[in-house]
């Protein structure tokens, strides 16, 4: 089985959900004819306007889910819908939704690791469940930005069988080298595909790196964006993950008696 995955890399308008939704719809309209799965960046409706999240957050995720269901069904495409700020009671979570091409929400994942350097912990609550899901029978996982710095968290998903890691981010330009190195390492050590969608542009506090990446289980970069807005697309052969795991049986050699 093969998938074409497209990362929709764009400049997120700071604190302006209506503008960002229009931009996402433009890219989805443009790319849905060419891909099986579309991936959006982190906090793509609001950007990191953390100080105003109390006002901007989507109550129970109702607006985001309604939009996502209609959009995925209209275009007949699976969407890993980046993440949005969702209010649940008194908490706000950095939340990823995944919709299948029939317009059904099949997974909700809340970012588990909050990045204190950008004050996330002051405005957001951390999730406590993993991002594992199956899409068209393909074992997959969704993760958000800072999560990729925690290999133990990634391994939890791949030991459940995930062959594709979908990652949404707002990764800053000064740490672009970390972004690339971490993603390639996660692909190699877990023998899986990685599709990582970053944003570009800037906000009042940060300049973002772009360079969305699609990586195969050997750690080879299949597609990479630049600093500008655009589509990062690659076709992947999903059988390759199983073949790599068979050729170098890392998972069979894990020393559970030691770690």
Swiss-Prot record:
Residues 3-238 form the CN hydrolase domain. Involved in the methylthioribose (MTR) recycling pathway. Probably catalyzes the conversion of 2-oxoglutaramate to 2-oxoglutarate. InterPro entries: C-N_Hydrolase (IPR003010), C-N_Hydrolase_sf (IPR036526). It comes from the Bacteria. It comes from Bacillus subtilis (strain 168). The active site is at 42 (proton acceptor), 111 (proton donor), 145 (nucleophile). The gene is mtnU. Belongs to the carbon-nitrogen hydrolase superfamily. NIT1/NIT2 family. Disruption phenotype: Impaired growth on methylthioribose (MTR) as sole sulfur source. SUPFAM superfamilies: Carbon-nitrogen hydrolase. Pfam families: CN_hydrolase. This is 2-oxoglutaramate amidase. It catalyses: 2-oxoglutaramate + H2O = 2-oxoglutarate + NH4(+). One of its GO terms (molecular function) is 2-oxoglutaramate amidase activity. Coiled coil: none annotated.
């Amino acid at each position: 089985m093969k998938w074409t995955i497209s990362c929709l890399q764009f400049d997120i308008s700071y604190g302006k959900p209506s503008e960002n939704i229009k931009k996402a719809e433009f890219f989805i309209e443009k790319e849905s004819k060419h891909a099986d799965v579309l991936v959006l960046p982190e906090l793509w409706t609001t950007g990191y306007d953390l100080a105003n999240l109390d006002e901007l957050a989507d109550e129970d995720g109702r607006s985001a889910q309604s939009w996502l269901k209609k959009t995925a069904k209209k275009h007949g495409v699976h969407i890993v819908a980046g993440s949005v700020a969702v209010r649940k009671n008194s908490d706000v979570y950095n939340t990823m939704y995944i919709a299948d091409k029939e317009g059904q929400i099949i997974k909700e994942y809340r970012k588990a690791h909050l990045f204190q350097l950008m004050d996330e912990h002051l405005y957001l609550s951390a999730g406590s469940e993993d991002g594992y899901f199956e899409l068209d029978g393909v074992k997959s996982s969704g993760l958000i930005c800072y999560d990729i710095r925690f290999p133990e968290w990634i391994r939890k998903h791949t030991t459940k069988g995930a062959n594709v890691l979908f990652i949404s981010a707002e990764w800053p330009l000064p740490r672009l080298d970390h972004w690339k190195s971490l993603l390639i390492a996660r692909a190699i050590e877990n023998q899986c595909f990685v599709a990582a969608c970053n944003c570009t542009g800037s906000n009042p506090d940060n300049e973002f790196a772009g360079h969305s990446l699609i990586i195969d289980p050997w750690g080879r970069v299949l597609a990479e964006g630049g600093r500008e807005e655009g589509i990062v697309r690659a076709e992947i052969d999903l059988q390759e993950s199983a073949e790599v795991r068979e050729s170098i049986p890392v998972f069979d050699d894990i020393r559970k008696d030691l770690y």
